[in-house]
């Protein structure tokens, strides 16, 4: 018998997401991190709308919205001339916008959530080595007291960054290369009069090539920005090599760190307004690689976040992609711990997330070289892709067939939000996302006529049996459908938004996965498809 259900190595945003999602499903976790305390650095800053949707489902959206600042767009300057402004516009039906939040605040909020779920982080404790057999993972930890501890876990999740012990222990390849560019980062205040809420990108270009660059991302606080810029020669780490050959991330501890004078020198060259930098909170040199593992796990061990993929920070994709890795994996591991994982459920983590990791690595590398404005396609689609709202799992072995949707999202697509849903005893409408905050699958049964209500009851009963009771069910009724005898929880689609957002047909079943993606659509709702699908996912 294992000492713990899941051991998580690394307590950054990815590890904390995995731990919180497992703990709130009753899975016993240990979360270890080699650092004695959280780093007070604004490393990852951009928070994508899809991540905010995840935080809504996890139960920390209010805290995030109170702490973050909105990102309205980006101001572009080339050789001192202002270019076209990039507005971060999204369709009105998308519930959240782009935001900026320093990574240390993201980690604080996630760790607070973990504590509320009954978990904690063991700091100063590092994974040293591990081995697995068909039944358990045997791990060795180094302790802050100087000793070691041996333990067994049913599963191990490596969220331990670009130099991951878990990735190396699995023998995964990490193909890619380092980029020649080096950047220095600084968290400072400036006194310019540029509009609040906008990132700033100012470059110097000669013969079509950028030879100097300044990027400023707004942070919470008055005129406060996380600035990145080319590293001057006296701060370069170009000759330094990391022991494992992976050159990526902050390297301030390996040499002199940038001071205000270095940042001010770049501002004097590239700032679109004369300004003075003050109140330097931290600074470092940042080196970049692009790499991805050949697989996201093996047996009882998995990798997520920077342990699985690293790439340029353009578009704020890295942390957000890692959070989605963890969010995809956690519900599947929880099902396995509870003995309700069908064949292929855990394997679907690699099948679903690795193609997305490849796409993100390729796209961020392209943007680092040419900018987001060089992307083909219309700007609206580009913005939805950057917001991570177009990523999905069509064709996955654990979702239904594409083509089952009449006119709306297909199995594998993100489940969209909608408003105007009315409970009989509530005077105000609610949004669909409020129904999807549960920990299990949610089955939505749409009825546009009273004749379909009996089949909704039958569909719910059969689905709950197939899911071993681990299923939330709600009937969604067209505005004029009366259902006094319905035994299910029900809402009325008061503004017809659900029908339009989903292209829902009368008598249809829509199954939403715990990670907010559609698993199946089926008509009629009481046919064999839904129970069979749930049995496949969760075992018989």
Residue ranges: model-predicted function:
Residues 2-5, 9, 24-25, 78-81, ...:
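Helical substrate-recognition/capping region of FAD-dependent monooxygenase/halogenase enzymes
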Residues 1-381, 385, 474:
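Core Rossmann-like FAD-binding/catalytic domain of the broad FAD-dependent monooxygenase superfamily
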């Amino acid at each position: 018998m294992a000492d713990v259900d899941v051991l998580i190595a690394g307590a950054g945003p990815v590890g904390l997401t995995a731990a919180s999602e497992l703990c709130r499903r009753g899975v016993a976790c240990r979360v270890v991190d080699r650092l004695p305390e959280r780093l007070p650095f604004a490393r990852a800053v951009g928070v994508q709308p899809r991540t905010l949707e995840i935080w809504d489902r996890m139960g920390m959206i209010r805290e995030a919205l109170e702490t973050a600042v909105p990102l309205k767009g980006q101001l572009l300057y080339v050789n001192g001339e202002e270019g076209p402004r990039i507005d971060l516009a999204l369709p009105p039906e998308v519930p959240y916008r782009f935001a900026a939040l320093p990574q240390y605040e993201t980690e604080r909020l996630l760790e607070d959530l973990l504590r509320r779920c009954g978990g904690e982080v063991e700091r100063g404790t590092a994974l040293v080595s591990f081995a697995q057999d068909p039944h358990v993972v045997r791990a060795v930890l180094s302790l802050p007291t100087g000793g070691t501890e041996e333990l067994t876990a049913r599963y191990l999740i490596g969220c331990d960054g670009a130099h991951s012990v878990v990735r190396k222990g699995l023998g995964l390849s990490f193909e890619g290369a380092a980029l020649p560019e080096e950047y220095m980062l600084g968290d400072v205040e400036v006194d310019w009069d540029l509009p609040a809420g906008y990132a700033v990108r100012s470059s110097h270009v000669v013969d079509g090539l950028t030879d100097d660059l300044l990027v400023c991302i707004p942070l919470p606080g008055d005129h406060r920005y996380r600035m990145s810029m080319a590293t001057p020669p006296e701060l370069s780490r170009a000759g330094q090599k990391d022991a494992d050959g992976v050159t990526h991330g902050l390297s301030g501890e390996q040499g002199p760190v940038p001071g205000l004078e270095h940042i001010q020198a770049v501002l004097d060259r590239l700032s679109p307004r004369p300004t003075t930098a003050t109140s330097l909170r931290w600074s470092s040199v940042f080196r970049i690689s692009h790499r991805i593992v050949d697989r996201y796990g093996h047996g009882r061990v998995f990798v997520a976040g920077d342990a699985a993929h690293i790439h340029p920070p353009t578009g704020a994709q890295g942390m957000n992609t890692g959070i989605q890795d963890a969010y995809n994996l956690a519900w599947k591991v929880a099902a396995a711990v509870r003995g309700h994982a069908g064949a292929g459920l855990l394997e679907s983590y690699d099948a679903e997330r690795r193609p997305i990791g490849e796409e993100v690595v390729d796209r961020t590398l392209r943007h680092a070289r040419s900018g987001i404005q060089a992307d083909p396609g219309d700007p609206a689609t580009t913005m939805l892709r950057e917001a991570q709202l177009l990523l999905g799992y069509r064709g996955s072995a654990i979702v239904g067939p594409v083509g089952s949707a009449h006119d709306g999202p297909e199995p594998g697509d993100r489940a969209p939000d909608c408003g105007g849903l009315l409970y009989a005893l509530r005077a105000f409408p609610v949004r669909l996302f409020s129904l999807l905050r549960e920990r299990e699958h949610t089955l939505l049964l749409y009825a546009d006529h009273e004749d379909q209500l009996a089949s909704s009851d039958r569909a719910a009963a059969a689905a709950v049996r197939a899911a071993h009771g681990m299923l939330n069910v709600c009937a969604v009724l067209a505005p004029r459908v009366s259902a006094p005898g319905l035994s299910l929880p029900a809402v009325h689609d008061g503004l017809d938004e659900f029908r339009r957002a989903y292209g829902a047909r009368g008598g249809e079943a829509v199954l939403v996965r715990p990670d907010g993606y559609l698993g199946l659509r089926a008509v009629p709702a009481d046919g064999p498809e839904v129970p069979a699908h749930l049995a496949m996912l969760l075992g018989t």
